Amino acid sequence: MRIGINMLLWTGQVTEAHRPTLEMIKTLGYDLVEIPVMSGAVAHYADVGRWLEDLGLSRTTSMAFTDPAADPISPDPDVRRAALEQLHWQIDCAHAMGAAKVIGPMFQVLGQFTGTGPTDDELRWAAELLRAAASRAEGSGVTLAIEPLNRFECHLCCTLESARAWSRDVDHPSVGVMVDTFHANIEEKDTAEAIRSAGEWIRHVHISDNDRGTPGAGQIDFGAVVRALDSIGYDGDLVVEAFGRATPELAAATRVWRDTFESAEQLARDAIEFLSKWL
């Protein structure tokens, strides 16, 4: 397995100013970085890809729908079309960057609720969007990994089983699921068993502790997580995802109101040391 870290620990938009951070990540021994793709031009992400190539860092990309005007499960077909266009753009950015994966909750706008559980129409619309995006992804050599969240952030997909069922419905080789241990800690009765049940559908893993701080400093049993991944033959990426207060808009979006670690660099150092002992 390769170990990576999500750049959301530092920023929502990676620019040339972050090259020293990327160099530090490489020096610490990370194999890859996860780049958030929320705004900007495709050409910019091609530049980011070249910086990472020069450093010898592989990359994945993360996404989210945040604008109600681009909602995969809106009753308005024009709004759903805008969501598909956004996901196509994110796939194009990943391809330009040389990233093999786009990961995230690609099924609804974050934090937007209807007051009820998912409807048949919403599930159908979300599957239609993914099926359409999968063709673009396949042509770009990109895999889409559906990220289940939790009931406080979404209503459509909160467990690995629901993500797996949805992937089966989409039925495309470029679509799979991912594990995020923070969300699983909230929603799964047994995270390790959920991983074993999802099995071959798992394409990506976020290592994130219960307080979004340093992995291993909280309550989650990462040993059980890694053993479950070993049991299904998973040999993909483990990406550290943590959030702090350095970027106010990210702190607000992730509801991080207190410091849970000394510094981002210290977290990155401690996280790779912690994960390396399991691999």
Say what each PLM segment does.
Residues 1-9, 15-27, 98-100, 157-179, ...:
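Histidine-acidic metal/acid-base catalytic patches
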Residues 1-9, 61-74, 106-115:
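N-terminal small/glycine-rich loop or linker at the start of catalytic domains
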Residues 54, 77-176, 188, 258-266:
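Active-site acidic/histidine proton-transfer and metal-coordination neighborhood
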Residues 68-74, 110-116, 153, 186, ...:
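A short acidic, helix-capping loop that chelates divalent metal ions and anchors anionic groups
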Residues 39-56, 85-98, 127-135, 192-197, ...:
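Short amphipathic alpha-helices and their capping/turn segments at secondary-structure boundaries
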Residues 32-55, 106-118:
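Glycine-rich, proline-tolerant flexible connector loops at the mouths of alpha/beta enzymes
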Residues 9-11, 37-39, 65-68, 108-110, ...:
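Active-site-proximal loop/turn and secondary-structure-junction residues that shape catalytic pockets
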Residues 19-39, 90, 96-98:
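Catalytic domains of carbohydrate-active enzymes, especially glycoside hydrolases
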